[in-house]
């Protein structure tokens, strides 16, 4: 049996651009680890490589985000026309299983560990079902990834990734996890064994990235007690790692120091906003803005690069606040912003339901618009065009070369811990990527006003496919 596992991708500019980076989706390696030993499995990440459309597999699994749906169903339709069986899974497929079933032979609406082996067994017997929604087997069922399938020549800066936990205990109103997943975590011994015995390391750059990896968890700090136990177990391994976690974890100085001792050199946290009204509107009470400066200084002093994501377009945002964001950031000397987006009301979130009830969703939105860069609603205090104008300006300012120079100058000498300076240097391209939305000057970044990618538009017309309309 020949199986392909494909993580699809379309660039937020809607141009045909690849985006190799340190952190990539590891869903293909996860699914591959659930396939039977007799299967010949290939994995593809479209951020790194094109999908070979002339190849043939018996079974093709697709992993995708909401905004990649139109592109993914084009690929599925092309493969099905040539006799291949296609499968879709993920959050979009779980929320829209009936629509997805029109373009794929089977839909997985549950966790992969309980559903992928069952689906493959049914396919082998010629008894494939249309939908697989078996209950979760719990975090102990997470299998080691097929790290040996990662081709580091396609992405020279990529780090291997691992999951220690899933879900998040918080209830931010715009987050796709809210109301759908409880927080759960794997036994620490299981995680450590996978790192020691299964993980494969990036050999590029004269070994500078050897023994470095990323935790792919949505929130590695969902249980501070668990994180402490994990860090204690990581210390003897002498590895270098990064993770994403919520801001509240970083208020604990002893835990931050323990993370650094365990090899943590990079933390990403969704601060989202420096405006108290916006934080309140997001139901993100774990972000205490009065402590931001102290948390930043504490984390960098420990030898950890702290990176933030900011979003604009929230209901608390005003013209005055958005105008002053660069000033606020200048006051936070060591602040690093590596993601800048527009808040997106994903259809399965409380934010979407709130906007729907208030008739504030913009008309003509399609699944492609839910990419974290396109305004899909009318904010309370701003006209849609004002949001986009501020977004463009901030992309240019925060992603500028002078800002990257300040990033290097202010942070390189803050710590002498191993690989700290290396982490600071590798973060430069991340900051520069904030400028990506400016690469397509024709892009409006308002739902319903931008065409799909040229290739997808042509293929959909030829195949008789229509975009999925959300409003």
Regions found by a protein language model. Name each.
Residues 10-14, 99, 277, 281-282, ...:
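Flexible glycine/acidic-rich beta-alpha junction loops that bind and position SAM and/or redox cofactors
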Residues 52, 57-66, 228-234, 300, ...:
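Short, electropositive alpha-helical surface patch
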Residues 1-210:
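Acidic, low-complexity intrinsically disordered segments
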Residues 2-8, 17, 37-43, 123, ...:
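Radical SAM enzyme core and accessory elements
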Residues 99-118, 258-267, 324-340:
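Structural recognition of alpha->loop->beta junctions
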Residues 34-40, 237, 295-306, 332, ...:
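A structural motif corresponding to the C-terminal end of an alpha-helix
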Residues 144-307, 312-314, 320-322, 327:
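Radical SAM [4Fe-4S] cluster-binding motif and immediate context
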Residues 87, 108, 242-244, 307, ...:
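Structural detector of well-ordered beta-strand residues that form the stable sheet scaffold
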């Amino acid at each position: 049996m020949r199986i392909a596992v494909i993580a699809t991708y379309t660039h937020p500019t809607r141009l045909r651009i690849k985006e190799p980076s340190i952190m990539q989706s590891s869903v293909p390696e996860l699914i591959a680890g659930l396939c039977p030993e007799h299967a010949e499995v290939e994995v593809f990440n479209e951020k790194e490589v094109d999908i070979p459309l002339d190849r043939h597999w018996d079974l093709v699994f697709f992993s995708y985000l909401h905004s990649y749906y139109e592109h993914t169903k084009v690929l599925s339709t092309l493969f099905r026309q040539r006799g291949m069986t296609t499968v879709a899974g993920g959050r979009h497929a779980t929320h829209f299983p009936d629509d997805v079933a029109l373009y794929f032979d089977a839909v997985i609406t549950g966790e992969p560990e309980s559903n992928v082996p069952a689906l493959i067994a049914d396919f082998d017997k010629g008894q494939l079902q249309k939908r697989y929604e078996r209950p979760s087997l719990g975090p102990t069922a997470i299998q080691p990834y097929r790290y040996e399938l990662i081709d580091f020549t396609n992405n020279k800066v990529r780090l291997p990734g691992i999951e220690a936990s899933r879900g998040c205990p918080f209830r931010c109103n715009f987050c796709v996890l809210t109301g759908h997943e409880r927080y759960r975590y794997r036994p620490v011994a299981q995680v450590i064994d996978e790192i020691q015995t299964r993980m494969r390391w990036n050999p590029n750059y004269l070994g500078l990235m050897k023994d470095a990896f990323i935790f792919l968890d949505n929130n590695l700090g969902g249980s501070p007690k668990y994180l402490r136990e994990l860090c204690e177990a990581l210390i003897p391994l002498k590895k270098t790692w990064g993770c994403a976690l919520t801001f509240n974890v970083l208020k604990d100085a002893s835990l931050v120091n323990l993370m650094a001792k365990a090899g943590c050199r990079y933390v990403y946290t969704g601060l989202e906003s420096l405006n108290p009204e916006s934080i309140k509107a997001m139901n993100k009470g774990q972000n205490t803005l009065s402590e931001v400066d102290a948390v930043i200084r504490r984390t960098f002093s420990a030898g950890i690069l702290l990176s933030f994501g900011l979003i604009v377009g929230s209901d608390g945002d005003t013209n005055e606040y958005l105008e002053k964001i660069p000033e606020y950031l200048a006051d936070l000397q060591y602040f690093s912003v590596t993601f800048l987006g527009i808040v997106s009301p994903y259809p399965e979130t409380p934010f979407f339901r709130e906007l729907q009830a208030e008739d504030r969703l913009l008309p003509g939105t399609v699944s492609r618009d839910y990419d974290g860069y396109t305004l899909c609603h009318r904010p309370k205090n701003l006209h849609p065009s004002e949001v986009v104008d501020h977004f463009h300006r901030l992309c240019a300012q925060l992603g500028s070369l002078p800002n990257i120079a300040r990033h290097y100058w202010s942070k390189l000498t803050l710590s002498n811990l191993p690989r700290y300076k290396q982490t600071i240097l590798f973060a430069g391209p991340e900051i520069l990527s904030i400028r990506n939305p400016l690469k397509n000057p024709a892009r409006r970044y308002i739902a319903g006003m931008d065409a799909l990618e040229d290739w997808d538009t042509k293929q959909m017309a030829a195949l008789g496919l229509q975009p999925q309309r959300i409003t």
